[in-house]
Amino acid sequence: KKNVVNFLNQRKNQSGIIYCLSRNDTDTLCDYLNSQGFNALSYHAGKSADEKLDAQNKFMTLQNVIMVATIAFGMGIDKPDIRFVIHLNLPGSMEAYYQEIGRAGRDGKPADTLLIYGLDDLVIRRKMIEESDSNKDYKFNENKRLDYLLSYCESPECRRKTLLGYFDDVSNNCNNCDNCLDPPNLIDGTVLAQKLLSTVFRTGQFFGQVHVINVLRGSEDKKVLEKGHDRLSVYGIGKDKSINFWQSFLRQLLAFGHLQINFQKYGAIQITESGITILKS
C-alpha cells in the first residue's frame, strides 16, 4: 500500500487503473485509497451488474479517478487519458501484461506502468495452473508463459526492448524505463548462487523462501532453532546481505530455472538440474 500511495502522490489529478488478483484485495485497496483522499472505484466479478456498470460509467466520464479492479475490468475500455496502470500482483503472462498496460496513454501522451510482485504471487500463479482442469500440454505452456514474464521482471535490460522482443519485434533501448534510467549493477553471482543453493540443499529442499533465507542469514528464528538448522554449515553464510537482496536473488534463480517451487510440498523451494550444475561447479 505504501508503494502504491507514494506512486499516486506523484501523479495527483490523474486517472489510472490498479489491477489486483483477488476481489478482497480490490475492495480493501479501494477503501484504503478513498480514506487517503483519492477518488477510487472498485470493479470485480463479485459485484452486481448495476454496480459494475455504475463504476465503469463513472470511470469513463469523470477525470482524476482511479479504478481498482480484477482482470474482469478492461475489455472494451477506451478511455484516452489513462495516465498509469499498476499491477499489484504478478499477471498471468506477457500477453496479459501487454494488453493491460496498453490501456494507458491512448491519447498519445506519456503514461507510466508499475508492477509490484513477490514470490507469493508466483506461488499463487503456479498453483492456479497446476490445480486447473486443463490438460498436461496446456499447463506446460502456461508455466512457460509465466516463466517468460518472470524473466522479464528480473531482467536488467530495457523493459520496452525485452517486452517487444517477446513478440519478435526488434526495438532499441527506450531510455525511459527504470532499467534504462537507473541501470542495475551487474555482478558475478556464482558464489552467491552457490550459497543460496547450498542452503536449499542442506535444509532438505522442504522449506519455502522465508526459512531458507533465515538460515542463510543466521537468523535466530524459532523454526530455525527447532529444526536444528542453526547447526548447519550454511547457517549465517549470507548474513552480509539483506533480506531484500536474498529475496531478489532467489527470484532471479527461479527466473533462470535454477530453482523451482514444489506445490506438492506446500511451496517448498527445490533445486533443478541446472542448479545442481552450479552447485557442483
Report residues per predicted region.
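Accessory DNA-binding and partner-docking regions appended to nucleic-acid-acting proteins
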Residues: 141-143, 170-281
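Helicase motor core with emphasis on the C-terminal RecA-like subdomain
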Residues: 1-136, 141-144, 168-172, 178-179
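A general alpha-helix detector
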Residues: 81, 124-128, 145-149, 162, ...
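C-terminal accessory regions
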Residues: 145-170
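Short helix-to-turn junction characteristic of helix-turn-helix DNA-binding domains
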Residues: 8, 59, 153, 200-204
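Flexible coil/turn residues that form the inter-helical turn or adjacent wing/linker of helix-turn-helix
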Residues: 12, 156, 205
